[in-house]
Regions:
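Core register positions within helices of long alpha-helical scaffolds
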Residues: 34-37, 67, 98-101, 130, ...
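Amphipathic alpha-helical scaffolding segments comprising HEAT/armadillo-like alpha-solenoid repeats
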Residues: 4-18, 39-53, 73-85, 104-117, ...
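HEAT-repeat alpha-solenoid elements in large eukaryotic scaffold proteins
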Residues: 17-28
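Short inter-helical turns and helix N-cap capping residues of alpha-solenoid HEAT/ARM repeat scaffolds
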Residues: 55-57, 87-88, 119-120, 157, ...
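Extended alpha-helical scaffolding segments
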Residues: 157-183
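Conserved hydrophobic register position within alpha-solenoid helical repeats
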Residues: 31-34, 64, 95, 127, ...
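Residue-level detector of extended alpha-helical repeat arrays and alpha-solenoid scaffolds
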Residues: 28-31, 61, 92, 124, ...
């Protein structure tokens, strides 16, 4: 499928379109004409209508939310937060990219809520990474909370813990020192915790 004109400079959009095209073709056997039309749409009102109309497929809502988000339209916020917490990590990556571009002041609070929701711990990786990228006041407290939980014996979500360790090192806040020191004996997190401790300010 030819890339829609005007978006080739956005590799994340191109990657999303390729992924969704394969997904739709695998599920439906062919690509509906509406897919190409939506991929080329830039009108914010048309995109918002697609985002809010009942019965729209997930691929259409994802394209519309992404387009609105990177254009700075706050009407994309709720849809992008839902996609950030999706079980499909590729959708989460795309949503996180759009949320950063959106720069909505609600994003950090929403990401912190998703990251610290223990019932969704398996899907917290992208919210954790987003918090580190945002460098918001909510970032360090949320990452500390999540990492403390991931240090429990037998916890299966060590990749989330690793993202917390790396994020806290990137943020460089000395408030993270205690939890990073607690992570040093962890067999999967210890080396990363050592590196992050070296990055802390103060």
């Amino acid at each position: 499928m030819e890339k829609p004109e005007g978006i080739s400079e956005d590799p994340e959009f191109c990657s999303m379109i390729d992924r969704l095209r394969d997904e739709v073709e695998n599920e439906e056997g062919s690509l509906p004409a509406a897919f190409g039309e939506l991929a080329r749409t830039t009108d914010p009102e048309e995109l918002h209508d697609l985002l809010t109309a009942p019965g729209r497929p997930l691929w259409a809502r994802e394209i519309a939310a992404y387009r609105l988000g990177v254009a700075g339209d706050p009407r994309a916020f709720e849809a992008l937060v839902l996609l950030l917490n999706h079980r499909d990590p590729e959708r989460c990556v795309t949503a996180a990219h759009a949320l950063i571009r959106l720069a909505d002041p609600r994003t950090a609070r929403a990401a912190a809520a998703l990251a610290t929701n223990e019932l969704r711990a398996a899907y917290a990786l992208l919210p954790v990474r987003l918090l580190a990228d945002l460098r918001a006041p909510e970032s360090v407290p949320a990452l500390v909370t999540v990492l403390e939980r991931r240090l429990a014996n037998g916890d299966p979500h060590w990749r989330v813990g690793l993202a917390c360790v790396e994020g806290l090192g990137t943020l460089g806040d000395p408030l993270a020192r205690d939890v990073l020191e607690a992570a040093l004996p962890h067999p999967r997190l210890g080396r990363a915790a050592e590196r992050s401790l070296a990055l802390l300010a103060g």
